Amino acid sequence: MIDKAEGLVLRTVVYGESNKIITLLTREYGKLAVMARGAKKPGSRFNAASQPFVRAIYVYPRSRGLGQLKSADVITGYSKIRQDVFLMAYAMYLLELADKALDERVPQPALYDLFVDGLEAMDEGLDPDVVSFIVELRLLRHLGIAPHLNGCTVCGSVEAPFAFSLNHGGLLCRRHRQEDEHAVSLTESVAKMLYVFSVYDFSRIGTVDVKPETKRLLRQIMDAYMERYSGLRLRSKRVLDQLLNLGDD
């Protein structure tokens, strides 16, 4: 039986002299790998469709093992991202996040849409930090380890101001702020921003102008939370951080 799936290339591995094993995140079948024979050869019909964060329609025989790619029609390669080394680094981080966090052959169309929509938003000019925050928070929610952002984790109060507590896994109100001496104080607008990023999809975000100091604070919070609760250690994240540090010098 032949399967046909819309997919996003998460990573590729060279196999032999001219072949590639492509790991795809597909809408229909979840994460899976296929063999693209001859993909490394100049002029190969699979060359374009086997590049990271290319989205295409892939046709291959159904198999419990490694299927052999029969055809691929590229939908988009996100050309604007490819022209910017910083955007490339953000995109590679999102791809590795999907690759490491998602199980194989478990269809999850909502998460497929999340990563595709994130790349499209970045390609269309949305701040890549905002894209990353949204993807991270939505993915954490799917994994069942999202921070509590719609009120105090202790009493449920929705009255600002709040602080973010890594130990409590979310917000603390003024009354319970003292329960974590390391909690990070947030303005009302920043606390609301975190909540919005966790529940809105990209079509509802629109144009967002986030101050550099706010992005640094949110990144500090998200990095610490991801490290504590997700258990993911991503090489692409270290590369991205190094690149951003160079850009700040």
UniProtKB/Swiss-Prot annotation:
GO biological process: DNA recombination; double-strand break repair
HAMAP family in alphabetical order: RecO
Family of the protein in this entry: Belongs to the RecO family.
The protein's name in its UniProt record: DNA repair protein RecO
Gene: recO
Job of this protein: Involved in DNA repair and RecF pathway recombination.
InterPro entries: ARFGAP/RecO, DNA_rep/recomb_RecO_N, NA-bd_OB-fold, RecO, RecO_C
Metal-binding in keyword set: no
Organism: Exiguobacterium sibiricum (strain DSM 17290 / CCUG 55495 / CIP 109462 / JCM 13490 / 255-15)
Alphabetized Gene3D superfamilies for the sequence: Nucleic acid-binding proteins (2.40.50.140), Recombination protein O, C-terminal domain (1.20.1440.120)
Sorted UniProt keywords: DNA damage, DNA recombination, DNA repair
Pfam family, one: RecO_C
GO cellular component annotations of the record: bacterial nucleoid
Keyword hit for Hydrolase: no
